[in-house]
A protein has these predicted regions:
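Positively charged n-region of N-terminal signal peptides that target proteins for export
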Residues: 1-6
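Bacterial N-terminal signal peptides
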Residues: 8-19
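Sec/Tat signal peptide C-region and signal peptidase I cleavage site
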Residues: 20-24
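Non-catalytic cap/lid and distal C-terminal segments of serine-dependent acyl enzymes
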Residues: 25-342
Length: 342
């Protein structure tokens, strides 16, 4: 429980906002100034992802990363710090997310209120079609490996971290919550705690959710500029296909869409279903048992709450120490509320 408390203090420094294109259940308030809060240092760096090299859709292997260093970092030269890696959701990048969650003000306030000082890292995983799904694909590159190994290795090599898994937390919201779930299941060698917020895409997608109009819109996409003209959910289908049904023999997008010639493609949907964590969680229970703490957060009127509950139930069945918190539905989440649910 001590570890859970420490991890929750760590994640107190980070809260979330749903991307603006979606009907938001929660929004973050601009934080009030906390007496005695000291400024953190912000470094905007580029990290090369070996795992992303040669991806077919041309996404950059050099990724933007925002690193937030605690107030004592510059003065206490011999001190080392735990690290939290935070994964943004679909359609936004790391820089936009920092504005939506009011970083660095939130971090400064959390430290002033007693959260243990740590390094917080926000990597950018936005792609041609607005999101990598934090997965592994020849089309997008191996973002799973990039997060779990490339970035971790870089941060450990260039900053004064405590370089072991028990001093690393992985946090994500929405698609980032999916990423934290997926990567967390497969890479317990890299992280010691998981905090999963409103995770999407935990269960397989039903064929009935696909529309003929979407097929025609997707077929018209030949360039990244064409992709930018799509509606939110249409573009998300391209991102999903690029990540989960890549096809190196199908230019220019190098993916297989879920519909073709007016018909659902069952083989493609089977590939998508194979990437649903609820379908493969049982294979990684040994890894999940390695975590000191796993927490899941979701709104009590969030459409994602059922799948989040199912994930918690599976973990509980196997004896994993998992906390599930359901926030009361509201349009704004205030910081005292966030503090109480930690």
């Amino acid at each position: 429980m001590k570890t859970m408390k420490l991890f929750c203090l760590m994640t107190l420094a980070i809260t979330v906002a749903l991307c603006p294109q979606l009907a938001a259940q929660v929004q973050t308030d601009v934080p009030q100034a906390v007496p005695g809060a000291k400024p953190v240092s912000v470094e905007h760096i580029k990290v090369h992802g070996t795992a992303l090299e040669g991806n077919l859709e041309g996404d950059a292997a050099d990724r933007d990363v925002f690193v937030f260093l605690p107030p004592s970092y510059a003065k206490e030269k011999s001190r080392r710090y735990p690290v939290v890696y935070a994964l943004h959701g679909y359609s936004i990048g790391a820089e936009q997310w920092t504005h939506e969650i009011h970083v660095p003000q939130t971090i400064e306030g959390a430290f002033a209120q007693g959260a243990q000082e740590m390094i917080i890292v926000l990597p950018d995983s936005k792609t041609v079609h607005n999101g990598s799904m934090y997965s592994s694909s020849v089309t997008t590159g191996n973002f799973e490996q990039f997060i779990a190994h490339d970035i971790v290795a870089y941060i450990d090599a260039h900053y004064r971290t405590i370089p072991n898994r028990l001093s690393r937390g992985l946090v994500g919201h929405s698609v980032g919550g999916y990423g934290a779930t997926r990567i967390g299941m497969k890479h317990s060698d890299a992280f010691g705690s998981l905090y999963i917020m409103s995770p999407c895409c935990l269960s397989a997608r039903a064929a009935g959710s696909l529309k003929l109009g979407d097929e025609k819109a997707l077929e018209a996409v030949k360039t990244p500029e064409d992709s930018e003209k799509l509606g939110f959910f249409q573009r998300a289908q391209l991102a999903t296909a690029a990540a989960w049904s890549p096809d190196p023999k199908n230019p220019p997008l190098y993916l297989d869409p879920p519909m073709k010639d007016g018909a659902v493609q069952p083989d493609v949907l089977a590939k998508w279903a194979a990437n649903a964590p609820l379908a493969f969680v049982d294979q990684y229970i040994g890894n999940l048992r390695q975590y000191r703490a796993i927490a899941i957060d979701v709104g009590d009127q969030d459409g994602l709450r059922m799948d989040a509950g199912k994930l918690r139930d599976v973990l509980d069945k196997y004896g994993s120490r998992t906390a599930l918190k359901c926030m009361k539905a509201r349009t704004r989440v205030r910081w005292p509320t966030v503090s109480r649910i930690m």
